[in-house]
Design a protein with these regions (language model features):
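Acidic, small-residue rich beta-repeat scaffolds with periodic aromatic anchors
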Residues: 21-107, 207-300
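A short beta-strand motif characteristic of beta-propeller blades
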Residues: 87-91, 136-142, 190-193
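Beta-propeller blade termini
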Residues: 99-106, 146-155, 198-211
């Protein structure tokens, strides 16, 4: 009997061990199978990221190559007088790539400047070069803009012409006419490389002032007034609708304020019965006034 029991135990034990091992291995198989979709997703993500990076790198290299070739064209074609030319680059990997060059004596230093517009996928890159007798100086390396317009005039009233680029972002919640201002200081009489950016400005060079509309929703965004001090801007004031009167009157502040978030700031301002006359010529005033009484349905 004891011998039979021992024999049964010897036979039964391997069966139990095999069963246990089989049971223990199944979760590992399931786990391995469950990891496959995650690994595939990670692989696809890595491939997409690598593809995007490679595409961006290729575009960047092509853009720089195009700019260098445009500058070589300037050197080859420029004969010491005004010159305009443009061309489209045929490239199977690029939907659209074009170059426009304009060369004139734009500023008061009597030097010739080449403004090079490189358009890639609808984004325009603007570069300005000063053309000397023995050298070419890169004065402006502009950002990429979406369908920009540029102009040259004396923006700060110092008697010298400045270079301005106006653009509009592809996406925004609110009015956003963006200006990049490249000044030409009176002492140098040539365009400088740094710039000042402003949103929704209107320029008053004879007064050495800028009046404009801040970025934000009507009713909560303000008007601003800046004064030029050489190549610098000083903040003078901000005008906001008074939420306590549902926007029928206004409040003048010396700092930019957010009455919706900081209601106590209302007490710091000067109450105005009406909008000051000087602001009625601001180009984006319609956006500032685009509010109704319902805008201020919060208790103040």
């Amino acid at each position: 009997m004891n011998h039979l029991s021992s024999l049964i135990r010897l036979v039964f034990l391997p069966i139990v061990l095999v069963a246990c091992n089989s049971t223990a291995e199944k979760p590992q198989e399931n786990k391995s199978q469950g990891d496959k979709p995650k690994e595939l997703q990670k692989s696809k993500k890595d491939t997409l990221e690598r593809s995007y990076f490679e595409e961006q790198l290729a575009d960047s290299l092509l853009l720089e190559k195009t700019k260098k070739e445009a500058l070589l064209e300037v050197v080859k074609r420029f004969k010491g007088e005004d010159l305009d030319f443009s061309y489209v680059i045929e490239d199977s990997d690029t939907s659209y790539l074009a170059v426009t060059v304009q060369i004139k004596k734009y500023f008061e230093d009597e030097a010739y400047y080449a403004i090079i517009y490189t358009n890639m996928y609808g984004w325009e890159h603007i570069d300005i070069y000063k053309l000397g007798n023995q050298s070419i100086e890169h004065k402006v390396a502009g950002k990429h803009y979406h369908f920009p317009t540029d102009t040259i005039f004396d923006v700060n009233g110092d008697g010298t012409k400045d270079f301005l680029v106006k653009s509009y972002p592809l996406s925004s919640c609110c009015r956003a006419n963006i200006y990049d201002i490249y000044l030409s200081p009176a002492a140098k009489k040539e365009v400088v490389t740094s710039y000042i950016d402003l949103v929704n400005p209107t320029f008053y060079p004879q007064e050495k002032l800028i009046r404009g509309v801040e970025y934000g929703h009507p009713g909560w965004t303000g008007l601003y007034k800046y004064r030029w001090r050489g190549e610098h801007l000083d903040t003078l004031e901000y005008i906001y609708p008074d939420p306590t009167t549902k926007g029928r009157t206004f409040i003048k502040m010396h700092t930019s304020s957010d009455f919706f978030l900081k209601r106590n700031n209302i007490r710091k301002g000067t109450r105005l019965p009406s909008l000051p006359e000087e602001y009625k010529t601001v180009e984006d005033l319609d956006w500032f006034l685009l509010y109704g009484e319902g805008t201020f349905d919060t208790n103040f």
